[in-house]
Amino acid sequence: MSLTQIRKQELMTEYQAHETDTGSADLQVAFLTERITQLTGHLKANPKDHASRRGLLKMIGRRKRLLSFINAREPERYQALIKRLGIRR
């Protein structure tokens, strides 16, 4: 259920701040958003999978904290990121 290497590379080229960026907050939010999307689809097909639901809620909380971090420091970067990711917030 994790991200494939190919998809991870695609996300990295799209969201990384510079060539050697592997863990910026923007990139982490992009990875989490992709995994959240995958897990949401999984849970629609498997509604009784409570362990995955708990993992999904943890990921959503982590993404929320990262977005709050970005918003506190650079609100315009935050707005651009949520617009690019299509996150309604």
Swiss-Prot record:
The keyword Transcription regulation does not apply. It comes from the Bacteria. GO terms for biological process: translation. GO terms for molecular function: rRNA binding; structural constituent of ribosome. CDD domains: Ribosomal_S15p_S13e (cd00353). Keywords: Ribonucleoprotein, Ribosomal protein, RNA-binding, rRNA-binding. PROSITE patterns: RIBOSOMAL_S15. InterPro entries: Ribosomal_uS15 (IPR000589), Ribosomal_uS15_bac-type (IPR005290), uS15_NS1_RNA-bd_sf (IPR009068). GO terms for cellular component: cytosolic small ribosomal subunit. The keyword ATP-binding does not apply. Belongs to the universal ribosomal protein uS15 family. Part of the 30S ribosomal subunit. Forms a bridge to the 50S subunit in the 70S ribosome, contacting the 23S rRNA. HAMAP family: Ribosomal_uS15_B (MF_01343_B). One of the primary rRNA binding proteins, it binds directly to 16S rRNA where it helps nucleate assembly of the platform of the 30S subunit by binding and bridging several RNA helices of the 16S rRNA. This is Small ribosomal subunit protein uS15.
